[in-house]
Each structure stands twice: as C-alpha cells, then as structure tokens.
C-alpha cells in the first residue's frame, strides 16, 4: 500500500507519459509495473513503508541491490534494462516537478543487452499466412478483420500498436498513411491497394458504428482490438500450418523490411518506412522526397500487385 502522496505523484507521472511524451498505454503499464516492483523492494530493503523522502534519498546500494534481485529472479537483461529506464524516467519526472536534483540513479548504466537479430519469415511463409488467416475468427467480419490487419502490417511495416490505432481518418488520404510513431515522430507510408481494399471490405461488414477518430480494428465485443487477441489468432495459424515459432504480428514488420531489402530497396529508405528513431521526420523528407520513397516502395515490394 503506497502513501497517498506517492500515489498522486505516480498518477501525475503516468498522465505526463501519455499526454506529454505520447507513450502507448502498453508502455505506461509496463513502466508502472516496474516502478511498483522498485518501490516494493525499497519497502522491503528499508523495513518500513516507503515515503517521498525514501524515494529521494535512495542510494546506489539500494538501486544495485534491486537490480541484483531482478537478476536472481530470472528477469531477462531486456526486462532489467527496461525496469531501470522506467525508474529513471520517474526520477526525471521528479526533477521536473519537485526539488530533487541530480539523483544518483542517473549514474547507473543499464546492463548490456544481447543483440538478437530480428527474425523475418520467408516469403512462402508470408504467402501461406496471408492466404489462410481468414480461416480463423468464426464470424465473417472477424475473419476479414484478421486478413486486413495482417496484410496492413506486412504491406506497410507498421508496429502492431500503430496498425491497431488506424482510424477512418487514415483512409481519407488515397496515397499515404500518416503515422505518429514512437516518440511522437511522424512518418508517411504509401498505401498499398490490397491493404486499403481489404480494410474497406472489412468496414462494410463491421457490425459496429465507428466515429472517424475511433480505431477501426475491433474485438468481438466491439471494443478496440488488443495485440494479444490478434496474436492468439496467429498462434492457431502457426500451429495448424507448421509455420515458424517466431511468427507473431511483429515478425511481419521484420519481414516487410527484409523482403524489401532482398528485392532491391536501399537501407535508408527502409529505415524511413519503419520509422526508426535514428531518423527524424524532417531528416526523412529533406533528404529523400516522398516521390522517391513511393518509387522505391512500388518497384521493390513483392506484393505490390
């Protein structure tokens, strides 16, 4: 049980992450869980209920003990790093909103991550997936939703969270999808006709009325579709057709990039289409025109027809 003043700070921090930093709900929930774990450990470490003063005066020994505890509890290096990033983020917020200055936590480096290469699917596996994903859903509109969503991800390289945020407003531009990705960075991706046509067909039979700003991909109860629900459909597909274990919604984003590269697209254009943080929107379109991006996309992409 947290002190009410601490909980109030956490609530303000969460609002800040959503409204000011444009963090996704998934990231905010993960960060909140990491901070909660840290504060629970602090409570155990100090043998008393955590106060604001405990948080402000946490020393390097406490923080390293918490990281060691996570390691002993078999958290992955990635999870430990994310946890430390979450807590640092909270302390950075405290610096902005309280009298806290230059906390010791910022001197602690994240553990080195093992770099894993992203796993793409073969083009044959992608074709099998796109041809058979409609077999799952039990209701026609759900089956068409699954296919439209999967084609959209593979045809545009969107993150699953980005794809699930598509609204009717995105469909009004006949040529491009304008996406606000991580860190509020904007990128523009050419619409592939097959993706847009499937989405249009899906919306024609969707049994729920939606406003222009509402996400178009819905669950069976009419609420916004969540990533785990869609990935469960992919698990069924994967098991039935003997597809690779690493097949997930995100693997189609990796496949988008890999297949473009294999078909002659240059790395820089692919990075721009993916919206990687190393390239800002301004850099994207001062150095490479939208016309060039479209040309690269339409000449190199394997399912353009």
Curated annotation (Swiss-Prot):
Question: Which residues carry out catalysis?
Answer: 159, 182, 250, 253, 276, 285
Any Pfam family hit: Phage_int_SAM_1
The residues the entry assigns to the signal sequence are: none
Name the keywords, alphabetized: Cell cycle, Cell division, Chromosome partition, Cytoplasm, DNA integration, DNA recombination, DNA-binding
Q: Name one GO biological process term.
A: cell division
Query: Which InterPro entries would you find in this protein's record?
Result: CB (IPR044068), DNA_brk_join_enz (IPR011010), Integrase-like_cat_sf (IPR013762), Integrase_catalytic (IPR002104), Integrase_recombinase_N (IPR010998), Integrase_SAM-like_N (IPR004107), Tyrosine_recombinase_XerC/XerD (IPR023009), Tyrosine_recombinase_XerCD (IPR050090)
Question: PANTHER family from the xrefs?
Answer: PHAGE INTEGRASE-RELATED (PTHR30349), TYROSINE RECOMBINASE XERD (PTHR30349:SF90)
> Subunit comment for this entry?
Forms a cyclic heterotetrameric complex composed of two molecules of XerC and two molecules of XerD.
Query: How is this protein named in the record?
Result: Tyrosine recombinase XerC
Organism lineage reads as: Bacteria, Pseudomonadati, Pseudomonadota, Alphaproteobacteria, Rickettsiales
């Amino acid at each position: 049980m947290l002190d009410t003043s601490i909980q109030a700070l956490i609530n303000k921090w969460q609002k800040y992450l959503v409204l000011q930093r444009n963090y996704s709900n998934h990231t905010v929930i993960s960060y909140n869980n990491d901070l909660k774990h840290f504060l629970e450990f602090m409570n155990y470490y100090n043998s008393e209920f955590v106060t604001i003063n405990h948080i402000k005066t946490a020393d390097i020994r406490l923080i390293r003990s918490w990281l060691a505890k996570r390691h002993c509890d078999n958290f992955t290096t990635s999870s430990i790093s994310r946890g430390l990033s979450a807590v640092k983020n909270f302390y950075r917020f405290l610096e902005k909103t309280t009298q806290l200055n230059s906390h010791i936590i910022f001197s602690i480096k994240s553990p080195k991550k093992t770099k894993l290469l992203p796993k793409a699917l073969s083009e044959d596996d992608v074709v099998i997936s796109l041809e058979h994903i409609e077999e799952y859903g039990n209701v026609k509109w759900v089956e068409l939703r699954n296919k439209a969503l999967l084609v959209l991800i593979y045809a545009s390289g969107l993150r699953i969270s980005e794809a699930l945020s598509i609204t009717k407003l995105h469909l009004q531009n006949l040529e491009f999808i304008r996406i606000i990705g991580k860190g509020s960075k904007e990128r523009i991706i050419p619409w592939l006709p097959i993706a847009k046509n499937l989405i249009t067909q899906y919306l024609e039979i969707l049994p729920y009325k939606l406003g222009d700003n509402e996400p178009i991909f819905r669950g069976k109860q009419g609420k916004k579709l969540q990533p785990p629900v869609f990935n469960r459909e992919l698990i069924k597909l994967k098991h039935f057709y003997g597809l690779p274990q690493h097949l997930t919604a995100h693997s189609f984003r990796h496949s988008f990039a890999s297949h473009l590269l294999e078909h002659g697209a240059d790395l820089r254009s692919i990075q721009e289409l993916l919206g990687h943080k190393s390239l800002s929107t301004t850099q994207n379109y001062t150095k490479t025109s939208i016309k060039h991006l479209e040309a690269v996309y339409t000449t190199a992409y394997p399912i353009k027809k």
